[in-house]
Amino acid sequence: MRMLYFSKHLALTCIGLAAIFATNAQAVEQIKPQVDASALPALGWHEPNPLRGNAEAAAIGKAAFNQSCAVCHGQDAIGTRSPAPDLRRIGMGCRRIQDAALRQRCQGDADAFFIKSVRYGKQKFGIVHMPPWEGLLAPELAWALRSFVETAPKGTGIQSLSPTAAATQ
């Protein structure tokens, strides 16, 4: 009898929490970034990232990120204290792969995961964890975001707050 009472209350609590999280997750307003992306070449949604290593694309991506993505993923992609995942971790393990062909394949998989998440968003059990951005972001701007995230400083984010780190950047 006591177990049934506990199970009933646990189920009601879970339903209540799911409703709260669903409301909060869907409450994030999508803001289309207002950046000049005219320097970027017209691209499609293909992988791997065609703008990898392009410093100008990374700078455009940083501006767009801080306008549209930082509210969930942290300013300058420093997502260690943010409600959403730290995007700098996507493909992090690829850097340790010694074989160039395998490393390139790993980066391609990470690019595919990133771009699919941006285009279609993330939804689990009816809860929107990330809204879809297809239609709001052009493919070239999405790839610029990826280029920025790949070049964003790694670490805890605490270093970026120190005056010494800011002076060396």
Regions found by a protein language model. Name each.
Residues M1-F6:
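N-terminal secretory signal peptides that target proteins for export/translocation
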